[in-house]
Amino acid sequence: MPQDPSTRSSPARLLIPEPRAGRARHAACVLLAVCFVVLFLSGEPLAPIIRSVCTQLAALQLGVLLKGCCCLAEEIFHLHSRHHGSLWQVLCSCFPPRWYLALLLVGGSAYLDPPEDNGHSPRLALTLSCLCQLLVLALGLQKLSAVEVSELTESSKKNVAHGLAWSYYIGYLKVVLPRLKECMEELSRTNPMLRAHRDTWKLHILVPLGCDIWDDLEKADSNIQYLADLPETILTRAGIKRRVYKHSLYVIRDKDNKLRPCVLEFASPLQTLCAMSQDDCAAFSREQRLEQARLFYRSLRDILGSSKECAGLYRLIAYEEPAEPESHFLSGLILWHLQQQQREEYMVQEELPLGTSSVELSLQVSSSDLPQPLRSDCP
């Protein structure tokens, strides 16, 4: 049974991941407060507790410094290729910020106290801490978890999806979208049908989250038919003379056999994600491809949402393919989005007269410093 396109294309249904909100740090603060409460209720003397905390803190910071020394042993061989020959840049990259040193000094002060009842000297305690930290590093037990890697790449905007989204925007959408209305206006002179659908004069970008892209849309759905090409945009870019950019205009046939024009294309960077997951050299799994496809949609949505040049000139249509093949799923999805745009346009038009009258009123009032009659029949 065919599923309602609105449910398959809604953001809630697609489960687009939003940026993480720092709840892990909040949880750490809560657990820290719980630990303080437990220590307070234990009734133990305060001085030994502070000394133990300082020794543990020193051991942790010592581990950070030892890890930096191990990183330095590798990075010194990449001094010129990665760090422009700057030894200071290598040191800053390998070792933590300055406040780590302060924590190390504060924690290390605990080792200056006399040895405890167990007879272990401060020197032995420091040596054992170094031994444990180096053992952890040698066994590779300090690797970041998958969640930490994901958060790090997303927060620094250095994942594959973010790079593809920016490349798609800078190299293509920012070039062609500002001229879209002009191209549609020119094409409408020979295709009067377009004038009745000005509310959908946008580039409709299909974003299949499974990365299944058809090169020929007419083969994907028989209700989608090619109509014409929009006027070409010709530019000289990156040494290529008269580089050509163009869009294709399609008509979508609805259940009443009516035709709706639509400028339509797939988001081509998704082909890159699909090819990467099929190439062993890329080491890109299917799960990573699906995650990056969703992040690509989110990144592109955010980039276009903040672009003044592209405002009102595009429509992102993200969707998941149905589990069971549906011959007219794609055309039904596109028609639903076209109807949504038409409703949105009507809502704007209903609010427009109120806005226009208020503008006229403000112009009449501000035309002179003296009070003026608002009625035209008053002298």
Curated annotation (Swiss-Prot):
Phosphoserine modifications at: S366
Task: Establish whether keyword RNA-binding is in the entry.
Answer: no
Question: What lineage is this protein's organism placed in?
Answer: Eukaryota, Metazoa, Chordata, Craniata, Vertebrata
Alphabetically, the GO molecular function entries are:
2',3'-cyclic GMP-AMP binding; cyclic-di-GMP binding; protein homodimerization activity; proton channel activity
Residues annotated to bind 3',3'-c-di-GMP? S167, Y172, R243, V244, Y245, K246, S268
Membrane topology category: Multi-pass membrane protein
Quoted from the entry, the domain comment is: In absence of cGAMP, the transmembrane and cytoplasmic regions interact to form an integrated, domain-swapped dimeric assembly. In absence of cyclic nucleotide (c-di-GMP or cGAMP), the protein is autoinhibited by an intramolecular interaction between the cyclic dinucleotide-binding domain (CBD) and the C-terminal tail (CTT). Following cGAMP-binding, the cyclic dinucleotide-binding domain (CBD) is closed, leading to a 180 degrees rotation of the CBD domain relative to the transmembrane domain.
Gene3D superfamilies membership: 1.20.5.5200, Stimulator of interferon genes protein (3.40.50.12100)
Can you state the subunit structure given in the record?
Answer: Homodimer; forms a homodimer in absence of cyclic nucleotide (c-di-GMP or cGAMP). Homotetramer; in presence of cyclic nucleotide (c-di-GMP or cGAMP), forms tetramers and higher-order oligomers through side-by-side packing. Interacts (when phosphorylated) with IRF3; following activation and phosphorylation on the pLxIS motif by TBK1, recruits IRF3.
Q: What is this protein called?
A: Stimulator of interferon genes protein
Residues covered by region (Cyclic dinucleotide-binding domain (CBD)): 158-345
